[in-house]
C-alpha cells in the first residue's frame, strides 16, 4: 500500500487477521517485510500484478495512479487506503464515487473494517460491473499510443 500509508508490520498483521484461513489467496507486496508463504497469505517484495489481477476479486492498495489504473484495466473492484497524499485521496474518492470500490481511512484500518468492506464490494455486483465498465472506458480512450499519435500529429 505504499510507503508511509500504513506501516508494513501493521499492514501484515491486519490483513492476515482479516483474511488468514479464508478461501482467498492473499498477496502482499512489500520490501519492508520478509518473504513468507503461510497458508493462504504470500508476501514478497514484488508480484506480477498483471497476472494476479487476471484472477483477482478485490485489489487493496494505497490509491496511487498506477495501482488504480491497473485494477480498473483488469475490471477488479478496489479497496483503497490513501493516507494523506492528495493524489491518492482524489483517486480513492473517484473510485468510490464511480461505485468501483470503497475507501478506508487510516484510522479505520482494522481487520473488521477491511473484512466488512471487502465483503460488501465482492457481494455487490454493481461495484464489479462499475470496475469492469471503467476498465473498458480506459481501454477505449486509447492510452499511451493515442497520446504519441497526437504528439506526432501536433509536431507535423
Protein language model features and the residues they cover:
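Residues at alpha-helix caps and immediate loop-helix transition turns in enzyme cores, especially N-
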Residues: 10-11, 91, 143
Amino acid at each position: 500500500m505504499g510507503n508511509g500509508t500504513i506501516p508494513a508490520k501493521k499492514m501484515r498483521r491486519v490483513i492476515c487477521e482479516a483474511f488468514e484461513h479464508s478461501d482467498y489467496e492473499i498477496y502482499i507486496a512489500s520490501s519492508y517485510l520478509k518473504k513468507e508463504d503461510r497458508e493462504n497469505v504470500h508476501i514478497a517484495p514484488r508480484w506480477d500484478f498483471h497476472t494476479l489481477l487476471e484472477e483477482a476479486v478485490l485489489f487493496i492498495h494505497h490509491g496511487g495512479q498506477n495501482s488504480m489504473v491497473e485494477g480498473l484495466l483488469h475490471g477488479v473492484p478496489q479497496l483503497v487506503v490513501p493516507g494523506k497524499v492528495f493524489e491518492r485521496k482524489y483517486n480513492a474518492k473517484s473510485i468510490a464515487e464511480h461505485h468501483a470500490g470503497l475507501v478506508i481511512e487510516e484510522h479505520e484500518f482494522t481487520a473488521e473494517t477491511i473484512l466488512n468492506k471487502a465483503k460488501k464490494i465482492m457481494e455487490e455486483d454493481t461495484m464489479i460491473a462499475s470496475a469492469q465498465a471503467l476498465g473498458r472506458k480506459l481501454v477505449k480512450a486509447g492510452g499511451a499510443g493515442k497520446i504519441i499519435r497526437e504528439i506526432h500529429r501536433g509536431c507535423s
